């Protein structure tokens, strides 16, 4: 199921090869989880002993450890590692065929690697550990995104090792930088590769008439070539202009700056990067640019395992959820769009209604008659749910079949769809823009926990939903002409006509 976890699938398939028959495949996959969990405990033991050694052994101590120091260091490692090993959370993930054992192993591995770097930070080739950490993070993205939570700890270890005057203020700065790195990886690199591949795919399939996924393959080769060019230029210490130019080109082709749904954000960030590289910062250390280039490149290598999802879906296997056999469906697959979104930091509550917009009046029969005998009707305003349109969505076209006219498409877009259909061969059609309902913001809040209107009855079994008048906030609309507050009308309720007074009353 989305998002696929291809590295987990490949590793589990490797262990399944050792099953004597099909009935034992699940046993071998569970054995994989057990083995990876055991390695996690080993890495945790090494991590604890390293940190305790730093606390108990002074830098200027010479000779071997004393017996007391040895027992403290080894005892701490054994107690800490086994306490985690036998905890319910870890133990039950270690004995099931799920991704969490693998994810724990990747997490333990990257933190142990930063400690290995910390031991050798002054050596000329210590950067290889940082690049290896980036590669493991790239691989672990194809297992579970939890591994990204190691980045703040890694940045703190790096900062305290490189800078001797660290304090609370600088530690907070380091944490903020780590959050920026997480955002660039999670919201930049991970979807950025797919966004760039989509543009290449449209160019080669719709523009040049190539077969499906040709553009994605071309993008992979182009990106690899540009990364190699940038790395070689930095390694050979070429001219500053060439090094900065290839560095900028590699950042662009990675798509990491195209954060969010708007392309303007990416172009603005690229312009800012170009200004910083070529006009503001003239003496960027080659070593820093080289580590950044290598890190992005190896993350790209690890992330390329998602090609398995495309290949597997193209084979049309019996279990083929969402059929992500092209980069457009793959993006929806990786973004977990089928699960919807949960407001974690800020968003709607159970009582946040959707906004509605006026679309015209209809006539309601009051049951009375006019003087001429015709029905006496009153106008009733009609509203529709207000929707916010997002990015254009594409779908694979059916060869030789004219695409159905999609709601929300412009006439020019419909004509372009028909033109591609008449051309024949493989092509992608525009199927409309993704729409999201616009909610009334008055009842939004920070950290909403009860937000789904579909689960109102379930919430009542868990907590008390007090809806008495004392606990409700009265809301008013503002008359745009007079500026006075007026009661809001219930656009769901039907107005009532009073024949005695001849008035129409709308429910508030």
Residue ranges of predicted features:
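Transmembrane-helix motifs of polytopic, lipid-linked glycan transferases
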Residues: 31-65, 109-113
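Specific aromatic-rich, kink-prone transmembrane helix
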Residues: 43-47, 90, 102-122, 129-137, ...
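Membrane-interface transmembrane helices that cradle and orient dolichyl/undecaprenyl
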Residues: 52, 57, 65-71, 110-129, ...
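Short hydrophobic alpha-helices at membrane interfaces in multi-pass membrane enzymes
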Residues: 71-78, 113, 120-138, 167-180, ...
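Transmembrane-embedded, aromatic-rich helix segments that form part
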Residues: 106, 146-159, 191-194, 264-271
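Membrane-interfacial entry segments at the cytosolic side of transmembrane helices
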Residues: 164-176, 208-217, 236-247, 262-266, ...
